[in-house]
Amino acid sequence: MDHKYFQHSDLAKVYCEKCNGCGDCCHGMTDTIHLDPWDIYQLSSGLGKSFEELRAAGILALHEEEGMILPHLRMQDGENGACPLLSSDGRCSIHPFRPGLCRLFRTFRYFIVDNGCDMPGKIKVRISKWLGIPELSEYEKYVSEWHYFCKDVKSFLASSDDTAFAQQLNLFILKVFFVTPYVIPEDGSSDFYSLFRMRLTQARTVL
C-alpha cells in the first residue's frame, strides 16, 4: 500500500484511462458499502425514491455496527453478487449521484490503495475532480461530523444495558437522518448540510 496521504487538491494516479466497464469493483462487496445520510439524500434525489422505497426495491438493507443500525447497498445474492445499480453493460447506472464510498474507490480518505483496480493505463487526476462532489470542503466537514456522532452513539450503546432504549435510539436515528427527507417545508427547497446540522444538534441531546 502507498502510505502517502493526499489532500483533495493533490494529483494522484487513480483515473483508469482504459476502463472497459468490467464492473469488478462493483461485485462481491457484500454489506461493505455503508451509506451515510448524504448518500441516502443523493440516492433519493437521483432515483426519485424515498428511503422506504429504496429498501422495498432491494437497493438498501440494514446492518448492525457496534450496536448501531445503519444502511448499506444490498448486493445481489451470491459470493460475487453485483451492486443492484450496475447496468447490463457493466457501468454504474447512478454515477452522477453514487455513494461516497464508491467515489472514494482507490483513494479512500485520501491514500491510494495499490492494485485496487487491476486495469492498466492509470493516469493522474486531481482528487477533487475524481470525487466529483460539489462543495467538497463542506462535504469533508460533514463526513467528520457524522463520523464522530456515530462514534459517540456506539460508545453510548456499549456502556448501556438498556436494550429497549437502544432500540428506540436506533429507530430515532434512522428516522431523523435517513427516513425524513432533507426538504425545507416552507418552500420545498433543500439545503442538505444546514438541515443535517439541525438534526445533528437535536440528536445529540438524547445521548
Label every PLM stretch briefly.
Residues 1-207:
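Short loop/turn segments that flank or connect secondary-structure elements
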